[in-house]
Curated annotation (Swiss-Prot):
The keyword Transport does not apply. It comes from Acanthamoeba polyphaga mimivirus. The chain crosses the membrane at residues 80-100. It is found in: Host membrane; Virion. GO terms for cellular component: host cell membrane; membrane; virion component. Its main location: host cell. Keywords: Host membrane, Membrane, Transmembrane, Transmembrane helix, Virion. The keyword Phosphoprotein does not apply. It comes from the Viruses. The lineage of its organism: Viruses, Varidnaviria, Bamfordvirae, Nucleocytoviricota, Megaviricetes. This is Uncharacterized protein R398. It is a single-pass membrane protein.
Length: 252
């Protein structure tokens, strides 16, 4: 996280930006769940805060990541849960139509619903949730693994080369496009190891047009070496808000 913050600061000096989103593993750390943290980064944790405080070991990691800590406050203020750039929505696992419907009673338009999602997660990270409604939606956004924008696997499991009008795409992707008036969805979360190990891919195509959904978790981490030892570096390039291109490095 520190690295990406540094990259954003450097990019900003040249008219660019590096936008970072929150994912389920950042939230797990804030919940005190370190199941997927390596032994080294848990037991030998070592962090010097900008204010001069030193945090070490497992207890140090717990204190650094607890809601309301200085580190998590920075995380809350520098990262969103969902981001729309142009006509493309970016989020970790995907905002499902069923989640949008659960926000209907708030009487918010589609953009305000996304702002509300960002606000509730941010308030939780800042340790500033207040009232029953905040707690209710915090549980929905963060803990409900079936529909949470950090946890659901719906978008990640749709097969390649699936039409936008198929049941799988229509009931999740197309309805989300309609509700939020967007053109494309980009998600991570579910490693794309089932697509002939091709990594980043798109699906939910519309006749005469490109794919409406892109999945960009190619299983690039070393933890997936057992499944794909020859994985390559990939990026999804988006130009002029309409041209999507998957760039893949040459295999060794």
């Amino acid at each position: 996280m520190i690295f990406f913050d540094m990259m954003h600061n450097k990019a900003s000096k040249h008219g660019g930006a590096v936008y970072s989103l929150l994912g389920n593993h950042e939230l797990m750390n804030t919940q005190g769940n370190f199941d997927y943290v390596s032994y080294e980064n848990y037991h030998n944790f070592d962090y010097d805060s900008p204010s001069g405080e030193k945090y070490t070991g497992s207890l140090g990691r717990q204190n650094v990541f607890k809601p309301g800590s200085n580190f998590v406050k920075k995380m809350a203020c520098n990262r969103l849960s969902v981001l729309v750039i142009g006509s493309t929505m970016f989020t970790h696992a995907g905002v499902l139509p069923v989640l949008a419907r659960k926000l209907d009673k708030l009487d918010l338009d589609s953009n305000k619903k996304l702002e509300y999602l960002n606000m509730i997660v941010r308030k939780w990270l800042l340790n500033k949730l207040s009232g029953k409604q905040d707690e209710e939606y915090k549980s929905l956004f963060i803990n409900d693994t079936k529909i949470s924008p950090f946890w659901n696997r719906i978008y990640g499991m749709i097969p390649n080369n699936t039409s936008i009008d198929s049941d799988q795409c229509f009931n999740s992707v197309k309805k989300t496009l309609q509700v939020f008036k967007i053109g494309k969805i980009v998600v991570g979360h579910t490693p794309q190891l089932f697509t002939n190990k091709d990594g980043i891919n798109g699906t939910c195509y519309e006749r005469g047009e490109d794919n409406k959904l892109y999945r960009i978790d190619g299983g690039f981490a070393d933890a997936f070496n057992a499944f794909n030892k020859k994985h390559v570096v990939q990026v999804l390039e988006i130009t002029d808000d309409k041209y999507f291109r998957i760039i893949t490095s040459k295999k060794n």
